[in-house]
Amino acid sequence: MHIVLEFFLVTFRVLWAFVLAAAKWFVRPKDKNVAGQVCLITGAGSGLGRLFALEFARRRAQLVLWDINPQSNEETADMVRDIYRQLQAEDSARRANSSADEEVLPCCNLQVYTYTCDVGKRESVYSTAERVRREVGDVYLLLNNAGVVSGHHLLECPDELIERTMMVNCHAHFWTTKAFLPKMMEMNHGHIVSVASSLGLFSTAGVEDYCASKFGVVGFHESLSHELKAADKDGIKTTLVCPYLVDTGMFRGCRIRKEIEPFLPPLKPDYCVKQAMRAILTDQPMICTPRLMYIVLCMKSILPFEAVVCMYRFLGADKCMYPFIAQRKQATNNNETKNGI
């Protein structure tokens, strides 16, 4: 009898979860305040990582930027400092013009910290994390964004590039999380964001290593989320970001069927990051951009494999990576010729 009652209770909770999820489509939850919180972003030197840094800077977060390229990382930091200076100038002007009863945001001593770190190397992650704890303090939000792509067919891809892709895109999530999660669990306070890809939910030809790494991120993130729930650490939030192809140059040359592309073009980086920020700031567990990706994921889960192949061929998604791979191969050959190899 006890299990029957529990079954009805679980059914009610499942239905209630659907109601709450549906309500969020009509009433957007209020964004949480990250002002003064330490937010660490990997791969901050370019692409989405840089845009994430600028968005968090506008929300007055203290930023810790990691990248393997110190020059590009400093360029991002300079952009962040410009935003901080603008915010402080606005605060000063508002404070000068405000009445005694008017509430004005406190002028925080906003700072940005840069660290050169190869997240594909475990020792580099752990040693840099120790420096962050010592020089900055405890990290509230960890945004795992760093990623690479080899751009080779499987049988033409050197083993070292396969290993590098797995290390940077997937294994780094384990190492950064192990470095910063203990303090979050101690405080029951924090947020872990995993930037994966739609190619971590469904795959295509020619990017076996990249797909495997992103599928790994999705599996890692989901298991971590369940582990935090099992440990009753409800104060630690997790968000999985799975965007469609983003126009950052990482997959330059990738093309689906030309008749379909106007309806499903590559995402603008700004749009992708703004959608992800909405999810992060409202503690949304997962976001796929565009929303059409949810439908594709559902169809992939229920349709026979041959039906999925037919859909891929119709959309031109079965060989969409081939032009990209050809461009990468041509660029490699040109560099070798230029260097006399």
Curated annotation (Swiss-Prot):
Keyword terms: Endoplasmic reticulum, Membrane, Microsome, NADP, Oxidoreductase, Signal-anchor, Transmembrane, Transmembrane helix
Chief localization: membrane
Pfam family membership, one: adh_short
Family: Belongs to the short-chain dehydrogenases/reductases (SDR) family.
GO molecular function, one term: all-trans-retinol dehydrogenase (NADP+) activity
Residues annotated to bind NADP(+): 40-64
Annotated protein name in UniProt: Retinol dehydrogenase 10-B
Active site, UniProt feature: 210
InterPro entries: NAD(P)-bd_dom_sf, Sc_DH/Rdtase_CS, SDR_fam
Catalytic activity as recorded in UniProt: all-trans-retinol + NADP(+) = all-trans-retinal + NADPH + H(+)
Catalytic class of the enzyme: oxidoreductase
PROSITE patterns the UniProt entry points to: ADH_SHORT (PS00061)
Amino acids binding substrate: 197
Compartments, record wording: Microsome membrane; Endoplasmic reticulum membrane
Membrane association type: Single-pass membrane protein
Enzyme Commission number, as recorded: 1.1.1.300
